[in-house]
Amino acid sequence: NNPTITMIEAERFLHDGGWDSTKRYFLVAANARNKISIIDTKERKLVANVDTGGTKPHPGRGANWVDPEFGPVWATGHIGDDVISIIGTDPEGHPEHAFKMVAKVQALSSGNLFIKTHPKSKWVWVDHPVSKKEVNRTTLGIFDKANIKGGIFKTLKVADYGKAVHMEYNKAGDEIWVSIWGNLGDADKGKAGEIVVIDDATMTIKTRIPNLLTPTGKFNVYNTVRDIY
């Protein structure tokens, strides 16, 4: 069969998004309207435009996990403020929470670009590379999936230069890799850029892969093919 194209009216301007845990619903940021547009790909229709309560949502692909109160959820951070918005995604098992913002977590600051978790991890990681506060640009925030009301559980400063951006888990879900944006002019100082490998359980740095010029997205093939995030 030839592929078909379905035009679905949503919101402005669609940029970055990912699947819910069932791979039926696609959630995408409408960053000019501070909303997440949710598409039912089975019925090929818009389910909802959810107000995120933040400014300029930027989820990357977002993060999926099962909350003890709200059931399956998906989350996004924001460029314009410190809000992490959590949206229910289970219309069958938790209809009262589905396609609504069910909770917020306060990040360290504005300037978040990516949020990441893994089914085998208890943590959700957020970056702040375009924060107005320089110290936060190289600091990751971590919160507990089972206790979102507890807010940020721990912070981890991963470099003394540049900006920390885009976390990615390994296949096992026990390491998280983060890029450091550096500067080519500082290559002789070892500050052109690198990837930092972190132990997810202990939240400590295991190793560094140095001398990379502004590495950004890193995608584990196993996780990416299966939309694990």
What are these regions (language model features)?
Residues N1-Y229:
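Predominantly soluble domains enriched in secretory-pathway, periplasmic, or organellar proteins
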